[in-house]
Amino acid sequence: MDCLPDDLLVQILYLLPTKEAVSTSVLSKRWRTLFTRSDNLDFHDPISGRPEDILKSFNDFVDSSLAFQGGKHIKKFSLHTKIKTFEYHVLDRWICNALEHGVSELHLHLMHESWPWLFSIPSKVFNSSTLVKLSLGSRLYCPSFPPDTSLPALKVLLLDSILFRDDQLSNVFLAACPALEDLTIHHTYHPCVISSKSIKKLSLSVNSGYYGAGYILTLDTPSVVDLYYSDSPRHNAPLFHLDSLAKVTLDLHFIENNNREVQNDADVKNLIREICNVKTLHLTCSTVEVISVYCKGGLPMFNNLVELVFSSKKEGWRVLLPLLLENSPNLETLVLSDLHRYTFGRRHRFVGIPIPPNNQIKVLRIMQYQGSATVLKHISHFLLNMDCLEVMKVNVAAALDDPKKMQLTEDLLKLPTASCKLKIQVL
């Protein structure tokens, strides 16, 4: 590596945790100060119950690394550690130091060593004119925001198990982020209201189980184009104000304790109605199970849908996929995962998935193909019933060796097709 220019070596050091970057200083005289030119500081010390000497060593290392920066700009500051109550002032000092250096990316993964939810986020985090990316976690409490809360440049925000009081998440925090475009929230409890006019990409994962069943989630985010939503079925469907929504990934799952009272009262139909105008829809395997249980009366039309990503066990292939295909007259791209799960017993003859005769599907993609005879029959059925098909992409399982992949490719190329334009790609 000695033949590489200094600027390239600094870029390589940027990708390393700070402790490893500093360790390169002993390699040679040339390397002695290279690490000080990196504008990325990444401190990872998740060990709990540390002896005092090790704790002091870590704290001194962070202090000295910040001191090395002098008056230079810090692009990225990451801190992953468990803390004690008496360490709050130390943490405040580090964060203030990073902010004073004009940090643009701040990633804090902090947890109180004894009492989760006890530690409050330092108020200095909420007033910065330079922050563009901010990550906060995990199991932290934010009782209030400072009166001068302002993050005018913030574009990307990740909140991992952050507890806010009342509606301060939207009314104060998000309101102070006028440039925010990408919001990710992972939480054990429902944030009741998420409101922002600027967000374009929203990822929301909730794992509240039975105790969150009564919450009503409201998304007032009219500029969101791309939504990822992971949750359990609820008594009350979420209320969406998503005028610009084009892409949705649904990851619904049954409550882990299998409380039938909650599940029987869940409202999934209204959730599906809220997203029926999207152009791209991704349904996970567990989502298909949930929809199959709660939407037996039918589905709305998906007139704008052009791309569907679908994964399921046996029931979903037999019932839900045909219904989705029937209700999506403008579908052009179909991506199928776990097709090998749709099998038939020895005493049952093969029955292909019903394909609407007027379908407009142009691209078919089969994921994790292993070459089973049943899946090959399904693929053959698709090719004979998709007249507009132009491209079929088959992703073979990574575990297959090259001779097996060649055999699978030959088998696929021999299949008869209804479309004269079809090109088959084995990936």
Swiss-Prot record:
A Pfam cross-reference name? F-box
Q: Determine the domain of life of the protein's source.
A: Eukaryota
Q: Which SMART domains match?
A: FBD, FBOX
Mind telling me what this protein is named?
A: Putative F-box protein At3g44060
Which PANTHER family does this one have?
A: RNI-LIKE SUPERFAMILY PROTEIN
Residue span, F-box domain: 1-46
Q: Can you name the source organism?
A: Arabidopsis thaliana (Mouse-ear cress)
Q: Where is the signal peptide?
A: none
